[in-house]
């Protein structure tokens, strides 16, 4: 039985889940990229090469790298998992009962790696056998999608996040990402590495409509010492924060949750696009998130199964209290005002900490990387000319499965 525990943002990283760019990114076009939450189309081949360098950088540091497509393929070897995924992804109500049944039967006979490829990369009407005939087929173009691609699977951080002894399988805010959660639900329920695991499922693993209670892992920082920091962004709502906080307290996995309100705009879509924890007392930040007027609360158990809410004077003060340190050190995005805005857009603050003071980040952010170096933080640089166009850095593209506490 594998161990899955994430005790901090900065303790030694031991195991991580990544997703190499695949068919889903090949199906991004100028006409559909906005709907699929991308600003531009990427060179998939180059993005794949850059991702390989990222994965190999982690392996060279002794970190186990598991790939989402491999995990999904292996999960499909379990008959119950395959049946459940086909039922959830190919719905009678979406396609009609006869067409859905025909598609499920055809997909069920497909080699599992090819099926996994379609579960993330999508399926068009032009790819199904000509023998499958239906009014639904007759009224669609061959390039229309039966299953839309999931290019944001690249950002494995968001769909699920491990917090101490458990995982949140997150109800995603945008329709373009909501099917991602089903792939992760299947992996955590049936894959041999997780099926018999002794871990808690805090949130998101039920067949219900979570409505406004959305949560994404890019907003969740496990800062350690019984504390969790969560950003309330355009993707994570106060409702989602409350549900997760209550579950953490119920299972005695956290003593406090710090909730900070973020600006609701694209460049600040998740907390980790503007703030990451990189050493015991050190955070990388875009200055906007630590302004004195930013609203911040600490949630603690009220002793009756509910939440006690305390308004904090500043986010920095809340962090110092939670971590038991006198003064938090902030490394702000580098360069002048123009360079800092450009580098934040290119994920200069979105670094993946491998152990205290050692991070992986894009080599293109020269001004911020220089500030890290002067502050004693080691940056292992990776190329990101194509990956970075998806608006996610090393932290966004990684889901830690095992990491030491502090």
UniProtKB/Swiss-Prot annotation:
The keyword Hydrolase applies. Its EC number is 3.5.3.6. Pathway: Amino-acid degradation; L-arginine degradation via ADI pathway; carbamoyl phosphate from L-arginine: step 1/2. One of its GO terms (molecular function) is arginine deiminase activity. PANTHER family: ARGININE DEIMINASE. Belongs to the arginine deiminase family. This is Arginine deiminase. It comes from Salmonella typhi. The gene is arcA.
């Amino acid at each position: 039985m594998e161990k899955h525990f994430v005790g901090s943002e900065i303790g030694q990283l031991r195991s991580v889940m990544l997703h190499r760019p695949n068919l889903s990114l090949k199906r991004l076009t100028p006409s559909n990229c906005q709907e699929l939450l991308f600003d531009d189309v990427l060179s998939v081949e180059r993005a794949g090469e850059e991702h390989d360098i990222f994965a190999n950088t982690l392996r060279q540091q002794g970190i186990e790298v598991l790939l989402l497509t491999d995990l999904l393929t292996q999960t499909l070897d379990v008959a119950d998992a395959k049946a459940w995924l086909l039922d959830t992804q190919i719905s009678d109500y979406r396609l009609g009962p006869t067409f859905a049944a025909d598609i499920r039967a055809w997909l069920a006979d497909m080699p599992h790696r090819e099926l996994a490829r379609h579960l993330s990369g999508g399926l068009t009407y032009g790819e199904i056998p000509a023998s499958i005939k239906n009014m639904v087929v007759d009224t669609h173009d061959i390039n229309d999608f039966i299953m839309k691609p999931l290019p944001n699977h690249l950002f494995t951080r968001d769909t699920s996040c491990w917090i101490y002894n458990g995982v949140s399988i997150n109800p995603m805010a945008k329709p373009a990402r909501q099917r991602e959660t089903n792939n992760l639900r299947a992996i955590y329920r049936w894959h041999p590495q997780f099926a018999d695991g002794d871990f808690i499922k805090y949130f998101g693993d039920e067949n219900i409509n979570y409505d406004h209670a959305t949560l994404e892992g890019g907003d969740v920082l496990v800062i350690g010492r019984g504390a969790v920091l969560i950003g309330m962004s355009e993707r994570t709502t106060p409702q989602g924060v409350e549900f997760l906080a209550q579950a953490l307290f119920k299972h005695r996995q956290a003593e406090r949750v710090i909730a900070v309100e973020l600006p609701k705009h694209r460049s600040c879509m998740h907390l980790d696009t503007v703030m990451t924890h990189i050493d015991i007392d050190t955070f990388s930040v875009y200055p906007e998130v630590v302004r004195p007027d930013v609203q911040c609360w600490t949630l603690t158990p009220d002793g009756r199964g509910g939440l006690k809410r305390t308004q904090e004077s500043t986010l920095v003060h809340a962090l110092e209290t939670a971590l038991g340190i006198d003064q938090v050190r902030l490394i702000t995005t580098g360069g002048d005002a123009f360079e800092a805005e450009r580098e934040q857009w290119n994920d200069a603050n979105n670094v993946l900490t491998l152990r205290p003071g050692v991070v992986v980040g894009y080599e293109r952010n020269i001004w911020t990387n220089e500030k890290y170096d002067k502050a004693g933080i080691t940056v292992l640089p990776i190329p990101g000319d194509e990956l970075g166009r998806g608006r996610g850095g090393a932290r966004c593209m990684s889901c830690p499965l095992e990491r030491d506490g502090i």
